[in-house]
């Protein structure tokens, strides 16, 4: 008699199911953490696409200089010819020889033998590139962008979302140590003095011959050095701001009123109103820890300020290289301006030791795409934690910055930050002299075997104790004086009392603390 074998139950043991579930969760976690790094260098996973060496080299091709303040209409371009390079090399060697007599003289170039040269303006830079999936505006024409920033272009919420695209672009490989060092050297190149010779061409109106010959070089303007790779059709714009006495690493030890006005306007909470002893750089201060927000925005947008000047320089570069990929870089103030420029036009920007530029980015109403993941941004801030300017701690009445008249009160950066922990690794103490560009290059960027990892900044709020009102008259107009009548028994009396009530209440604030929605 045949017996039917009992069917086996196809059920896994609880231990088996637990192992499968654990492995699945671990795979999902690994995928989640690897996704930003994957997307940050593009959609391709091949090593060749992630890290590509440029076929050509970057050489200095032209220099722009733009006035600020009373000279803000002045804008010139110099083509870097062999004659200019030769004259610059002679001046560099002469300046270097003279600087050897002073122990505290800031070096004009790195002391590293790998990058040694007798003429920084004839140096050829090698940069590695990487693909980057970047979210930026579809329409990036300067005229459209300016109308968008100034609120002259009306669009619905759907139209505003549709104007952002995911764009595959070429960006500098910020994970490559040599590329980071080369970009820092390009930033330092903008500090090296140029002989006041050459065929300067007026970009805007004719140059005023009564202006001093050293305009734009030593104290009263912004300079942009243009490096070009003819093979890859890539431009690197290195930005330098004005010199700053007392702030090391800012080039010449000279200063102007325009320098402090613009620095204090960009990086202070309210017109450099540190205390009653300070002279403010604008008239937006209302009263104790209260500031006119609309006034600040207008001051930053003025044509004689830094931001407008650097936008004009970018327009000149764009006209010169209309089809090229453009990257921007800079150190300190130049790095902050590079970041603002990159934010405005959707350009990859690499900044070194720059002050926090999130606050001026918001005040200028620069484009921030909705729901933007940090790994889809093209802005990187390199710095170390022994630099109080970069870390946002160079403030307060007794700080080094305050003692020389600078209100560096911002600490928050946009994009990603790439911080070297020199305090723990090298035993450095926080000191303003650690801000110097060549100290950063020689002892930090070249002092580590790898470039610092770039991560999303920690949650940060600038000027948390300040109140920013829509306008100077808003606070007084929001209070009403009303008359009320009260009746008492058995006799009826009438009295008039003044009651102060608020006509509106803030029911919604953005993450910077500004009120965005009011309720009556």
From Swiss-Prot:
Binds to both phosphatidylinositol (PI) and phosphatidylinositol 3,5-bisphosphate (PIP2). It is found in: Endosome, Multivesicular body membrane; Prevacuolar compartment membrane. The keyword Transmembrane helix applies. It is an enzyme of class 3 (hydrolase). The gene is ATG15. This is Putative lipase ATG15. It is a single-pass type II membrane protein. Its EC number is 3.1.1.3. GO terms for biological process: multivesicular body membrane disassembly; neutral lipid catabolic process; phosphatidylserine catabolic process; piecemeal microautophagy of the nucleus. PROSITE patterns: LIPASE_SER.
